[in-house]
From Swiss-Prot:
One of its GO terms (biological process) is peptidoglycan biosynthetic process. This is UDP-N-acetylglucosamine 1-carboxyvinyltransferase. It catalyses: phosphoenolpyruvate + UDP-N-acetyl-alpha-D-glucosamine = UDP-N-acetyl-3-O-(1-carboxyvinyl)-alpha-D-glucosamine + phosphate. Belongs to the EPSP synthase family. MurA subfamily. The keyword Cell division applies. Cell wall formation. Adds enolpyruvyl to UDP-N-acetylglucosamine. It is an enzyme of class 2 (transferase). It is found in: Cytoplasm. InterPro entries: Enolpyruvate_Tfrase_dom (IPR001986), Enolpyruvate_Tfrase_sf (IPR036968), MurA_subfamily (IPR050068), RNA3'P_cycl/enolpyr_Trfase_a/b (IPR013792).
Amino acid sequence: FEARFRFVEEIIRWGADARTDGHHAVVRGIRQLSSAPVWSSDIRAGAGLVLAGLVADGVTEVYDVFHIDRGYPLFVENLQSLGAEVERVS
């Protein structure tokens, strides 16, 4: 799947120490992610971006969430039921 590491570019926008290495993504921990607009490239990456956005400092906007909708119906509602501050904006 040629786009499977596209999410790495997105988390780098947040300040993550990350890179791709052939068939692997290498991500090192940092103290705090800074919010930035990011784009979902597939179902799992999109869900991961939303979850990481919950701990990022500031407001995170995730675009192309239709990918998430395909695999996780009621994703936003489920996160809200767990106490997450997340909303869908049209």
